[in-house]
Amino acid sequence: MDASPNHVARLTGKRVLVVEDEALVSMLIEDELRDAGAEVVGPAISVDDALRLVETAATAGGISAAVLDINLDGQHVAPVADQLAALNVPFLFATGYGANYDVGGHGAVPVVQKPFDLEQLVATVEALACASTRR
């Protein structure tokens, strides 16, 4: 996938965790983030996978931001969100559930609705990663 001129290298040097159980959606997210210069951590397709990646990444360069699908094959992503919040890693939720989603106590976190505009997703990740003190 060619990099859009609107977001070329905006995420250079940033490590972004992708937690998404739908393979095609995950590949789209990963491609856009890489096109924007990010190093993608993951993807994780389950809560357990994501928690392992967070633990490993915390000692291997950190995580600048994360994209979390709210529902991972019936499991709520809240434990991952809680762990990221405890580490001061900013994240956003991606959901296809419209207004009927549970953010598990993280009401101030940005929510990107599926199907999402990839430019909006990258811009939101960029804002999170650049505001983060953990680069």
What are these regions (language model features)?
Residues 20:
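Conserved acidic carboxylate
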Residues 46, 66, 74-79:
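Acidic catalytic/metal-coordinating carboxylates
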Residues 1-15, 60, 103, 110, ...:
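Non-catalytic signal-transmission and effector/linker regions of two-component phosphorelay proteins
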Residues 43-65:
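Acidic, metal-coordinating helix/loop segments flanking the phosphotransfer/catalytic sites
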Residues 92-95:
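Hydrophobic/aromatic residues positioned on beta-strands within the core alpha/beta folds
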Residues 23-42:
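Two-component/phosphorelay signaling modules centered on CheY-like receiver
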